[in-house]
A protein has these predicted regions:
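A generic "structured core" feature
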Residues: 114, 120-130
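Gly/Ser/Thr-rich helix-start
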Residues: 109, 127-129, 144
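Domain-scale signature associated with acetyltransferase and cell-envelope carbohydrate enzymes
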Residues: 1-78, 102-104, 111-113, 121, ...
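Short helix N-cap motif at coil->helix boundaries in the Bergerat
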Residues: 133
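Short, flexible, glycine-rich and Lys/Arg-enriched loop motifs at helix boundaries
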Residues: 40, 83-92
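Conserved SAM-binding loop
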Residues: 64, 84-86, 118
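Glycine-rich NAD(P)-binding loop of Rossmann-like domains
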Residues: 90-101
Length: 154
């Protein structure tokens, strides 16, 4: 069994016996965290990584997270997605790409990090952003989506 420094309630942790896993010291998982590491995957966590409530990490290929990185509520990390094809769903496989997150990062609530992304060191990502391309070190990322407000017809 994987031993975490601090663990909240009701986690779902599924790590294949053939996965390559490295955990740093003082890793904290709050409540309702989901961690899945597949059979051919590599998953590495640095020291003092903190996952707040309701985070989900799905590793089928390679996810690496540097030391002293914090994740807000509801963060999702995926190193794979479904491959689109016209086949029946049971025949569809995954497209995979590594996710590398540097050290000393702060990932805000409800951020989604997609496959094939490298996030440098000392990065802050604001709440609700969808990260689908690389972020250089020492950056601040905010999701700037316009709010469309229309009058409701009577």
């Amino acid at each position: 069994m994987v031993d975490f420094h601090k663990a909240g309630e009701y986690q779902y942790i599924s790590i294949s016996p053939t996965a390559q896993v490295e955990l740093g010291q003082d890793v904290t998982l709050r409540s309702f965290v989901c961690l899945e590491v597949g059979s051919e995957a590599t998953f590495k966590l640095g020291n003092r990584v903190f996952f707040n409530n309701h985070c989900s990490i799905r590793c089928e290929h390679h996810i690496e997270i540097g030391k002293d990185t914090m994740f807000g509520d509801g963060v999702r990390i995926f190193d794979h997605n479904h491959q689109y094809s016209n086949y029946h769903i049971e025949k569809i496989s995954f497209n995979k790409g590594p996710v590398i997150i540097g050290k000393n990062c702060w990932i805000g609530s409800n951020v989604v990090i997609l496959k094939g992304v490298t996030i440098g060191d000392n990065v802050i990502i604001g709440a609700g952003a969808v990260i689908h391309k690389d972020i250089p070190s020492n950056s601040i990322v905010v999701s700037k989506e316009e709010l469309v407000i229309k009058e409701r017809p009577q």
